[in-house]
Amino acid sequence: MVPGEYKLQPDKVPYNVGYDDISLKVKNVGDRPVQVGSEYHFYEANEQGLQFDRSQAWGKHLDIPAGTAIRLEAGEERTVKLIDFGGKRRVFGFNNKVNGWLDVDKKADTYNGYPLEKSYPEEK
């Protein structure tokens, strides 16, 4: 083996298996390129530059391999595939639009049936 050499298996490695995906048309209406990473909460991605149905993107990220990104040049329009976040479905940071549970029913003030005024469910 040569230093720095990669030895890859011939078969494709599956990723994001078992997640339902949606297709969403996205347009960069800005004057500069925009990149969005694989695990970025797509709902919160560049509000000024990217135009798409944000309600469809709530709780979802790009269906691309971890550590990669997509780039949309100024004026470019394309269709992307999005999948749900897994795990405990909590999102923090990004553009600070969520900073908590993704599945909170704001009208009912509950999280999966737990009243928010009491506390979040115990972590297991």
Swiss-Prot record:
Keywords: Cytoplasm, Hydrolase
Catalytic activity: urea + 2 H2O + H(+) = hydrogencarbonate + 2 NH4(+)
Keyword Repressor attached: no
SUPFAM superfamilies named in the record: Urease, beta-subunit (SSF51278)
Subunit-structure text: Heterotrimer of UreA (gamma), UreB (beta) and UreC (alpha) subunits. Three heterotrimers associate to form the active enzyme.
Pfam families per the UniProt record, alphabetical: Urease_beta (PF00699)
Organism expressing this protein natively: Limosilactobacillus fermentum
BP-aspect Gene Ontology terms: urea catabolic process
Presence of keyword Iron: no
Subcellular location as annotated: Cytoplasm
UniProt similarity note: Belongs to the urease beta subunit family.
InterPro entries: Urease_beta-like, Urease_betasu_sf, Urease_subunit
Main location: cytoplasm
Stated name of the protein: Urease subunit beta
One function term, GO molecular function aspect: urease activity
NCBIfam families tied to this protein: PRK13203.1, urease_beta
CDD domains found in the cross-reference section: Urease_beta
E.C. number(s) listed in UniProt: 3.5.1.5
Pathway: Nitrogen metabolism; urea degradation; CO(2) and NH(3) from urea (urease route): step 1/1
An example Gene Ontology CC term for this record: urease complex
Gene name of the record: ureB
Taxonomic superkingdom: Bacteria
